[in-house]
Amino acid sequence: MSQVKQIQGKALPLVGDDIDTDRIIPARFLRCVTFDGLGEHVFADDRQQQGGNHPFDLSQYQDATVLVVNRNFGCGSSREHAPQAIIKWGIKAIIGESFAEIFLGNCLANGVPCVTAPHGQIADLQQAITADPNLAVNLDLTTAAVTYGDRSFPVILSDGAQQMLLDGQWDTCGQLVQNQGKIAATAEKLPYLHWQTSAA
C-alpha cells in the first residue's frame, strides 16, 4: 500500500479565497478519457488572463510539490478533474486555510493530504515562499506539522484522513488488488454467489 507520511519540497503560493473547481480546470477539459495530460491545463483560463504571470507559469515554481492556498479552496462543482489536474501538474500536498468538503475528499481518495492552519500562518508561509522560492517546506503527517526554515506550526486534518494516509488505506484500488485472495475466499462462502451449483 502507498503510505503517505511526509512530503518535502519546494512550494507554490496561490493567494486568494474561494478559488473554485472551474478555475482549477475549466469545463471544456472534462471530456478527456483519462486524466493524463490534465496537468498542462490546470488554471488554464487564469493563466491565459495573466499572460504568463500566474504562479503555475512562473519558472521558480515549476518543480514545486506543495501548494499553499487560502480559504475555501476547491469550492464549486464536484469534479474529480480538479484535484487530478493539480496532481498531474506535480503537486503532492496542499496546505490552506480551508477546503471545500468534496474537493478535500477527492484529494484524499488520490493520496493528496489537504491540511489546514489559521490565516496568519498561511500568509506568513506564502510570503516566505515568495521571498525565497527555493525554500524547503516539510509536511509531516505523523506529527501533523509544517516546517520551513527555522519555523514550524501545527496543522489540522481529521483523524480518519490522517490514519488513512499513514496506513496507505486511501488507495482503495490498491487495497482491492492486495486483498484479492481474501476477497475470493469470502466470495466462496457466500451461497447466493453459487446458487446454480447449490441447486444442482
Swiss-Prot record:
Q: What does this protein do?
A: Catalyzes the isomerization between 2-isopropylmalate and 3-isopropylmalate, via the formation of 2-isopropylmaleate.
Write down the InterPro entries for this protein, in alphabetical order. Answer: 3-IsopropMal_deHydase_ssu, Aconitase/3IPM_dehydase_swvl, AconitaseA/IPMdHydase_ssu_swvl, IPMI_Swivel, LeuD
For this chain, one GO molecular function annotation is: 3-isopropylmalate dehydratase activity
Q: Which Pfam families match?
A: Aconitase_C (PF00694)
Gene3D superfamilies given for it? Aconitase, domain 4 (3.20.19.10)
Instruction: List the CDD domains hit by this protein, alphabetically.
Output: IPMI_Swivel
Identify the pathway: Amino-acid biosynthesis; L-leucine biosynthesis; L-leucine from 3-methyl-2-oxobutanoate: step 2/4
The organism's superkingdom is given as: Bacteria
Keyword list, A-Z: Amino-acid biosynthesis, Branched-chain amino acid biosynthesis, Leucine biosynthesis, Lyase
- For this protein, the Enzyme Commission number is 4.2.1.33
Q: Which reaction does it catalyse?
A: (2R,3S)-3-isopropylmalate = (2S)-2-isopropylmalate
Name this polypeptide is given:
3-isopropylmalate dehydratase small subunit
Give the organism the record lists. Answer: Synechocystis sp. (strain ATCC 27184 / PCC 6803 / Kazusa)
Q: Give the protein family.
A: Belongs to the LeuD family. LeuD type 1 subfamily.
Example GO CC term: the record gives:
3-isopropylmalate dehydratase complex
Oligomeric state and interaction partners are given as: Heterodimer of LeuC and LeuD.
Q: Which SUPFAM superfamilies match?
A: LeuD/IlvD-like
Biological process annotations from GO: L-leucine biosynthetic process
